[in-house]
Regions:
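Alpha-helical scaffold segments
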Residues: 1-83
Length: 83
């Protein structure tokens, strides 16, 4: 049975506000950036870094303060884009 439109909207809202789900949905389903989910994605160092490298494919200055919260993800980000 297909999702009803109301359920679809609720599900998208749930995905959008979850950094992990939003990253994978953007990368694997939408296959493009998802500006509405970016405020949620950027607050998680791992998914912010992965979103920059896999979806945006460029530096993401707005997310850098959050990425820097994790030495590991900061290192990955800087290896890809420089300091």
């Amino acid at each position: 049975m297909p999702l009803k439109p109301a359920n679809y909207k609720n599900r998208i809202q749930e995905i959008k506000t979850n950094p992990e789900k939003a990253f994978f949905y953007s990368r694997d389903v939408m296959k493009t950036r998802w500006p509405e989910a970016e405020p949620y994605i950027m607050k998680h160092p791992a998914y912010a870094c992965l979103y920059a490298t896999d979806v945006l494919k460029k530096k993401w200055p707005q997310a850098e303060p959050y990425i820097k919260d994790s030495a590991y993800w900061q290192s990955k980000y800087e290896n890809k884009f420089g300091k």
